[in-house]
Amino acid sequence: MHKEIAKELLLLAGGKNNIISISHCTTRLRFDVKDETKIDIHAIENLQGVQGTFFRYGLFQIIFGAGVVNKIYKEVVHVWETAPSEEPVHQKKASRKLNPAAAFAKTLSDIFVPIIPAITASGLLMGLIGMIKVFHWFAAGSPWIKMLDLVSSTAFILLPILVGFSAARQFGSNPYLGAVIAGLLTHPDLLDPSMLGSKTPSSLDIWGLHIPMMGYQGSMIPILLSVFVMSKIEKLLKSIVPKSLDVVIIPFITVMVTGCLALIVMNPAASIIGQIMTQSIVYIYDHAGIAAGALFGGIYSTIVLSGLHHSFYAIEATLLANPHVGVNFLVPIWSMANVAQGGAGLAVFLKTKQSSLKKIALPASLTAFLGIVEPIVFGVNLKLIRPFIGAAIGGAIGGAYVVAVQVVANSYGLTGIPMISIVLPFGAANFVHYMIGFLIAAVSAFIATLFLGFKEETE
């Protein structure tokens, strides 16, 4: 079935020669195309499994939903690569240039998307442990708790290495070298930042410079900057070193030069940048909390349209790793925006007279309550416009509430109902306020959508 859909999709997208590159995120298939006029959008939207389509940053994006898109992607890529062509195969890179801010955010998003399953699994496990402790399902010190704790913490311990691997691949470099550089920056001999209150890092004296033996566990910006520089060094060496020596010489020089630069120059600088970003966000949260919650809750769904919301993971990881913060106060806001989309979708389901729209609206709304919003956003609310505005209103109200009562989480990557597992560890009050915010966001979006109404096409 997926193979047939892939063949039709490729044909309706203008054929092999109209496609420059193919990529995907957790719910969407993305085509970078030469000529948008060759795409039969209406026919694609009528394909089995397609929940909606849209253009963003020059990419034609098709929503299939989580668990399906990766299967479709494999078949589409196989058909695309094996189909006959009168033109040479193009490099799989996006052809359109984005402005620097958009390009940076998109790159962050593309780096973190492949890591989401690991983050989600660990986040749910951490939440499960929190629930076990809150409800006393196991005795304190139980070997089961210790075992689950080991399993749940692994992804976050290895997160810098996973990011280094993914970033190197995104930058067109050797991903294993990226993992090595990330491993260097989280080496056990380097002091974990969380220990700063009780320990002082030793230092290396080189050429009059005092280099602190400080690790960067949980700090994403130093990892990203180091791997980016590494990719440039590796590419430069590939243009100089003879091919007969590149297997040995290029990795050796790349790791040695990047490692020294990372410890001496880049990471201290990147760490300062990360601290400034974190302190700025904390300042905004402390001094413009409710207004900031309303603003971020209102606009978050608009950011989701581009898929760039995944770029926030780097910021959230930094907040959790910071010993002076240690919690994630952003993800409750994102969650309010997501469940608001579900509330708006339920209003559409209740009000529409179209049977085809009802069939989409109800399951897509329920999916939004589970934290996956693309089906309801692109399949229903955005097409009708006003429900999307209603959801933004609900997200703003819910976002303001969770900031006002200071709802926090101990992980990221989860919203909606699954997020309960990562708010429970902070106590019953945190959980109750989260659920109140959940209801406020969903109900206010529902009411706002009913009030605004929407115009639908006749069947």
UniProtKB/Swiss-Prot annotation:
In the Enzyme Commission scheme, what number(s) does this protein have?
A: 2.7.1.-
InterPro entries referenced in this protein's UniProt entry, alphabetically: Glu_permease_IIB, PTrfase_EIIB_Cys, PTS_EIIC, PTS_EIIC_1, PTS_IIB_1, PTS_IIBC_sucr, PTS_Sugar-Specific_Components
The keyword Cytoplasm is annotated on this UniProt entry: no
- Is Transmembrane among this UniProt entry's keywords? yes
One GO biological-process annotation of the entry reads: phosphoenolpyruvate-dependent sugar phosphotransferase system
Look at the named UniProt entry and state the broad enzyme category this protein falls under. transferase
According to the entry, every stretch annotated as the PTS EIIC type-1 domain falls at 106-459
Looking up SUPFAM superfamilies in the UniProt record yields: Glucose permease domain IIB (SSF55604)
Q: Which residues cross the membrane?
A: 111-131, 147-167, 177-197, 209-229, 245-265, 288-308, 329-349, 360-380, 388-408, 412-432, 434-454
Write out the entry's keywords from A to Z. Cell membrane, Kinase, Membrane, Phosphotransferase system, Sugar transport, Transferase, Transmembrane, Transmembrane helix, Transport
Q: Where does it live in the cell?
A: Cell membrane
Q: Please state what the annotation says regarding this protein's domains.
A: The PTS EIIB type-2 domain may serve a regulatory function, through its phosphorylation activity. The PTS EIIB type-1 domain is phosphorylated by phospho-EIIA on a cysteinyl residue. Then, it transfers the phosphoryl group to the sugar substrate concomitantly with the sugar uptake processed by the PTS EIIC type-1 domain.
Q: NCBIfam families in the record, alphabetically?
A: PTS-II-BC-sucr
* UniProt name for this protein: Probable PTS system sucrose-specific EIIBC component
The lineage is:
Bacteria, Bacillati, Bacillota, Bacilli, Bacillales
Q: Which gene encodes it?
A: sacX
